Amino acid sequence: MTATIDNTQSQATTGGVGRVARVIGPVVDVEFAADELPEIYNALTVDVDFATASEQVEGETKRTLTLEVAQHIGDNMVRAISLQPTDGLVRGALVRDTGAPISVPVGDVTKGHVFNVLGQTLDVPRIEVTERWPIHRPAPAFDQLEAKTEMLETGIKVIDLLTPYVRGGKIGLFGGAGVGKTVLIQEMIHRVAKNFGGVSVFAGVGERTREGNDLFLEMTESGVINDTVLVFGQMDEPPGCRLRVGLAALTMAEYFRDVKRQDVLLFIDNIFRFVQAGSEVSTLLGRMPSAVGYQPTLADEMGALQERITSTRGHSITSVQAIYVPADDITDPAPHTTFTHLDATTVLSRPISEKGIYPAVDPLDSTSRILDPQFIGEEHFRVANQVKQILQRYKDLQDIIAILGIDELSEEDKVIVGRARRIERFLSQNMFVAEAFTGQPGSFVPLDETIDAFRRLCEGELDHLPEQAFFMCGGLDDVQAKAKRLAERS
């Protein structure tokens, strides 16, 4: 039988009925009969009269709030966190226990649509739903996991060469404010989702509504939206919503992996906002804060999300996660806790972005589990190491150059500095999603071409070309054409 879902949470009530005892912001205490206490994580619903709420909808007299049980606090009371604004909620209001956790629609019907944390559609009034899954689910068992390791080619030189991504792995994009995390994650959607052949799921966790709107319109124009599911819990949402929206998106992705037997790309922007929401909820529940004011359950909450993002027999979820680094401090507990779960970490650097080099990836701080000859081959590994050695030597010489000047270096070091500066510039690349702003077309550089170009750079074959020729270019053909134009101008 097909159920129709519009913008209301499923109302199948199998639990008890209680009454609101206290409301403090998004925290709601509810009293139930002793034999009807709901379980932890159960969804509760309560109707709010629009006459007492600031939010009015034409033609409707009530709206339904969804709460999630977080604690049993004694005296037949439970403490719940609201996933929507609680304005208009009053003491004594009837609260119904749904008897189950929050659930979201799954399946092909979700493709091409935008949802909130409750699985309500935001782009259309209603969709026909045949199946819903709860957002709280166990991670796959050990014997279900897939051990195969395969590289995911992106066509972005700095990533493919120095921090190669794993198909079915977890990828982290670390960076402070304004260094290009969201642009890079949108570029990954553009490059990988178009050629991927599977399904893409995007979770907007606590980020700007404008960015979500731009992403939806861009995907619609490019045609990618038909194989994409978007789930949003933005900056203006209560912390309970922002804490659960990642799980809602992941649940939809798991259905495609486990039931439809498809490979899935999961994009999460931003994991830090997930942690931040957990910290807010923890404080609201009165828990003792841990390091730097974060919740004591930080590692547990992160593990519950990350361990579900994995490959099972023959099919995978590949996740790309943007991680905001507060005050550019990579040792902050939020990014630090995320590190342990990732297969590849791409660190975006402010000093590099200040030079105008984009993507502003720090080639020395970024790492990958598969940067190993066993997975990527001897030639790729050797060239990547050569590039890193030259860049590290250039970094070591920075203080000497700043104090004495480049003329005081030995001839050998001068050659290394020249190559390092060319490498730095050649690691820049025009992005497809930035074409409208830069006026320059994006470029896709095959891995073999990237390896060959950097091998020639490291061995000195390109020392005769000017540094400017390497800036924001694709392959070597672009560099040589640009060098020719520069020579003609001079």
From Swiss-Prot:
Its Enzyme Commission number(s) read 7.1.2.2
Q: Which UniProt keywords apply?
A: ATP synthesis, ATP-binding, Cell membrane, CF(1), Hydrogen ion transport, Ion transport, Membrane, Nucleotide-binding, Translocase, Transport
Bilayer topology annotation: Peripheral membrane protein
Establish whether keyword Translocase is in the entry: yes
Uppermost EC category: translocase
Which GO terms fall under molecular function for this chain's record? ATP binding; ATP hydrolysis activity; proton-transporting ATP synthase activity, rotational mechanism
Q: What's the catalysed reaction?
A: ATP + H2O + 4 H(+)(in) = ADP + phosphate + 5 H(+)(out)
Source superkingdom: Bacteria
Q: Where does ATP bind?
A: 175-182
Question: Principal place where this protein is found?
Answer: membrane
Localization of this protein: Cell membrane
The UniProt entry, under CDD domains, shows: ATP-synt_F1_beta_C (cd18110), ATP-synt_F1_beta_N (cd18115), F1-ATPase_beta_CD (cd01133)
> Which InterPro entries does the record cross-reference, listed alphabetically?
AAA+_ATPase, ATP-synt_VA_C, ATP_synth_F1_bsu, ATPase_a/bsu_AS, ATPase_alpha/beta_chains, ATPase_F1/V1/A1_a/bsu_N, ATPase_F1/V1/A1_a/bsu_N_sf, ATPase_F1/V1/A1_a/bsu_nucl-bd
Q: What would be one Gene Ontology cellular-component term for the protein?
A: proton-transporting ATP synthase complex
Tell me which family the UniProt entry assigns to this protein.
Answer: Belongs to the ATPase alpha/beta chains family.
Its biological purpose: Produces ATP from ADP in the presence of a proton gradient across the membrane. The catalytic sites are hosted primarily by the beta subunits.
Record's subunit section: F-type ATPases have 2 components, CF(1) - the catalytic core - and CF(0) - the membrane proton channel. CF(1) has five subunits: alpha(3), beta(3), gamma(1), delta(1), epsilon(1). CF(0) has three main subunits: a(1), b(2) and c(9-12). The alpha and beta chains form an alternating ring which encloses part of the gamma chain. CF(1) is attached to CF(0) by a central stalk formed by the gamma and epsilon chains, while a peripheral stalk is formed by the delta and b chains.
Name listed for the protein in its UniProt record: ATP synthase subunit beta
- Look up and give the organism this protein is from: Acidothermus cellulolyticus (strain ATCC 43068 / DSM 8971 / 11B)
